[in-house]
From Swiss-Prot, chains A, B:
It comes from Limosilactobacillus reuteri (strain DSM 20016) (Lactobacillus reuteri). It comes from the Bacteria. May play a role in DNA repair. It seems to be involved in an RecBC-independent recombinational process of DNA repair. It may act with RecF and RecO. The lineage of its organism: Bacteria, Bacillati, Bacillota, Bacilli, Lactobacillales. A zinc finger (C4-type) spans 58-73. This is Recombination protein RecR.
Length: 200, 200
């Protein structure tokens, strides 16, 4: 039986290493690559290498950055008294798209998860504590881990750890999404919405 | 608002150029790339460049190949009296996986499509006719374009063109898939199955 030519087989193999891409999709993508403009393919290859080579985690907040410290940590106009703690770099971008938060961030790169065997020492908590010790400007830690059980566990762990230092610890509100129908909301979300109701 | 660091933004842009990959998936893939082994990323970049640089269409059959002519056209043990005509290189691999066809191939790189404005001169037909003129070893052309309306149109066009030269032209059988239920088959497939019924 004839096999795919080696360069094509290797490209298919590379595509299958991406999440959610199986043999069929990888083959389709590889053939598509052959039909792409030469420039686009060259830029694709360059951007793969450059992303891997030029991006690092900020030594202060752990967010992905080209320069260390990252532009957010360096920005004197931002409110350095607030640190918002997120699970991953993508969450920083989600918060920034909101345009309404002007404090700093801290990226945990994971959550405490007994099921996955991830303990507090496996995520970026030590550097958060170091930050708080070094910098007494910080007045509030806003915990923005996801509303999953692991996210809640991590939030609880952090609160217990930080509160004794006299720093205010808050958690993002849970409740109905804006525009959501009550009869489509799940029980946990409804429970959180009732629990966190506000006076009008 | 903070933007993604440039190397990451460029990588996301490259991923969005692939078919079926939007902004969200591209972002997910780009972040995943950052977490990949350095070697895997380097190999990915290399295979992109190599696939684009080292692969060409065989000057005889049009199939994708590293060497020209391709291994199938060069293979003296294959039956050079049969040419199976397909729409795209992927179809050659599908036929080869069957292990039962030992003739040659011809890849059209498309079909005649009045809707898309693709005429006979836009696909790899001229080189097929040249092949037939030069090589009187060919006894049969098996047309294996898809069973779509464009595929049927192309098949009809080729048959009309080749038959006068005294070469046998055949078409792959259409009918029920092996293992298919009759009550789930569409009308056209059932019609083709009845039309092409064989004596037992």
């Amino acid at each position: 039986m004839i096999q795919y030519p080696e360069p094509l087989a290797k490209l298919i193999e590379s595509y299958t290493k991406l999440p959610g891409i199986g043999q069929k999709t990888a083959t389709r993508l590889a053939f598509y690559t052959l039909s792409m403009q030469e420039d686009d393919v060259t830029n694709f290859a360059k951007s793969l290498l450059s992303a891997k080579r030029d991006l690092h985690n900020c030594s202060i907040c752990g967010n992905i950055t080209e320069d260390d410290p990252c532009p957010i940590c360096r920005d004197k106009t931002r409110d350095h008294s607030q640190i918002l703690v997120v699970e991953q770099s993508q969450d920083v971008m989600a918060m920034e798209r909101m345009h309404e938060y002007h404090g700093l961030y801290h990226v945990l790169h994971g959550v405490i998860s007994p099921v996955a065997g991830t303990g507090p020492e496996d995520i970026n908590i030590t550097s958060l504590l170091k930050r708080l010790k070094k910098d007494d400007e910080v007045k509030e830690i806003i915990i923005a881990t996801n509303a999953s059980s692991d996210g809640e566990l991590t939030a609880g762990y952090l609160a217990k750890l930080i509160k004794p230092a006299g720093i205010k610890v808050t958690r993002l509100a849970h409740g109905l999404s804006v525009g959501a129908d009550i009869d489509y909301a799940d029980e946990m979300t409804l429970f959180k919405a009732v629990q966190g109701r506000t006076e009008m």
